[in-house]
Each structure stands twice: as structure tokens, then as C-alpha cells.
């Protein structure tokens, strides 16, 4: 097949007839086509190392060009940052027992942007045991939140038992919420969902619950309190 780019009399005739594009236009088309092919090639390479693990990037780094290696290094750093963020986010998952001497390190210096939930309790108080049980479940559900517990008097000397259970919510060492005493928790009927909702109101955890699970009971109580006062019957008046 004759080369359409060749400077021949026949090609000149074809160009004049409009059968072949002008020579300059043809060159531009070729350059555009070459650029597209290069872009597709680069995208293919990018897709290749986007799908690779950090270990695979290390194994295959000799196969890439200098330009590819710069892009790969950017992806490697991005992957590493994502991995570290995931490890940090999921590094808890259980309730840690501390004493007073651990307070500064575990609470005040817990870390930037980190939520800490501290339960002050004592053995032998049933509601404290119930809350510890619920917190264990919530710690597994929200591994990015630091859940800790401590016997009350090891953190606060002479802390009165009547204030137990007590839950403090911290962020970056500052108290964001506090729940003190059995009445705040509603007694032994407290469910894990109710505790989750209560803690979510402080901002410490991001619950998927759409409404307070205790609300229907509260509405029922309120409706009974707000209900109409029954009218006295005439017979009641006569009996007085």
C-alpha cells in the first residue's frame, strides 16, 4: 500500500481532490493519535500499580520507567498513609483497665482527635457490671474510640459510691460529657442500644440508630401523665 505521507505527484493530486487530508493536517492527526496512545498507555500503567499491594509495587518497580516510578512513589506513600490511618482507626476494640497513675497517659495524652470514654466503677455494684458488659460490646463495634474503665477510688480518692456508675467522655483531654449516678442510666433496664444512643449524643460515636430506643417508653409515660384527669362521679360526691 502506498504511503499517504510520501511526497509524490499522485498524493498531491489526491490532496487537491480532498481524498487525502492536507499534509500539515495529517501530521497533526498523527501527533494527536500518538498522544492518545501515550495517554492510554500511561493510564494502563497507572491502573496496573493502582491495583497492586505495597509488596507488589516493591517487586515490580524495576519494570517501570523513571516517570512511572515517580507516580508509583506517590501511590506508595498514599497507600502507606491509608494503611496507617486504618491501623490507627481500628487499634482499640476492647475496654482497657487503668488505674489513677495511667490517667494522664491514657486520657489526657490519648492522642489528637481521639475520643476516650472512661467508666468509673466498683465491684459489687450491679449497674456498673452491666455497663462494663455493654461497653465491651460497643468497644468492638466502634474500634476507633478508646474505651477504658477504672475502679473509681483509684482515679478519684474518696469518690462516693452513690455517684456510680460514672462515665466521662473526653476528646483531646477535654471533658465533652459526663453521666453520673444510676438515675442517669435508667437503672438495670439499660440496654446496649440506649447506652450507644446516650454516648452518640456526646459526639463520641457515630451511631446508625435513627432514634432514641428509649423514646417509645418515655412517650408512653408522658402520655399517661398528660392524659385527662378523670371526672368525679356524682356518687363519689355523695359518698364524701
Swiss-Prot record:
Q: Does the keyword Phosphoprotein apply?
A: yes
**Keyword tags:** Acetylation, Angiogenesis, Apoptosis, Chaperone, Cytoplasm, Endoplasmic reticulum, Phosphoprotein
Residue ranges spanning the membrane: these are none
- Phosducin domain location is 27-181
Note the CDD domains from the entry.
Answer: Phd_like_VIAF
Q: What tissue specificity is annotated for this entry? A: Expressed in blood vessels (at protein level).
Cell membrane recorded as keyword: no
Q: Quick one: where's region Thioredoxin fold? A: 92-240
The record's subcellular location field reads: Cytoplasm; Cytoplasm, Perinuclear region; Endoplasmic reticulum
Q: Which GO terms describe its biological process?
A: actin cytoskeleton organization; angiogenesis; apoptotic process; chaperone-mediated protein folding; negative regulation of chaperone-mediated protein folding; negative regulation of ubiquitin-dependent protein catabolic process; positive regulation of angiogenesis; positive regulation of endothelial cell proliferation
Q: What induces it?
A: By hypoxia and heat shock.
N-acetylmethionine: residues bearing it = 1
Record's GO cellular component, any one?
endoplasmic reticulum
UniProt record similarity statement: Belongs to the phosducin family.
Function per UniProt: Acts as a chaperone for the angiogenic VEGF receptor KDR/VEGFR2, increasing its abundance by inhibiting its ubiquitination and degradation. Inhibits the folding activity of the chaperonin-containing T-complex (CCT) which leads to inhibition of cytoskeletal actin folding. Acts as a chaperone during heat shock alongside HSP90 and HSP40/70 chaperone complexes. Modulates the activation of caspases during apoptosis.
What is the name of this protein? Answer: Phosducin-like protein 3
Name the encoding gene, please: Pdcl3
